[in-house]
Amino acid sequence: KVLEVRVVADASIAYEDFGAGDPSTMNRETVVQKLLKSGVWPVIRQRPFDLVADPAKEPKSIFVSCFDTNPLAPDLDYIVHNHANEFQTGLNALSKLTKGKVNIVVNSKTAAREFLDAKNVVRQTVDGPHPAGNVGVQIHHLDPISKGEQVWVAGVQDVLIIGRLFL
């Protein structure tokens, strides 16, 4: 019979350091291994079917939707504000994962310099009511998937997390 269970905190908290590094100077395998080892890899999803991306495969392209039309969706311009370095570093890491394009899809009314000044990407502009901000709709119109192909997607907040991992 168990009368009591005590959970006692450690005197100090320790985190594993995955090390900083510029992803633009790394090869694909190094970027993939760092994302896998750190546990960040599952934020990268593959379409069709919205599964966790298979690191052994290479996508046709990668999409980052910077425009969300879902009801009650957060303002992505606000989320990325003052995080240009993290966002660009995350995009640089994603660009190592494909020989194709990294597309960022923005609203035509965006004022976020972090989106407008992004480098090493193809900026696509969309406008309109929901579902214009849905990444699946964006892929369908901008870079349709054919049989046997994959397109990977990551959200703005995911790109920021990836960027912070490398900084």
Predicted regions and their residues:
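Buried, small/hydrophobic-residue-enriched core segments of structured protein domains
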Residues: 2-167
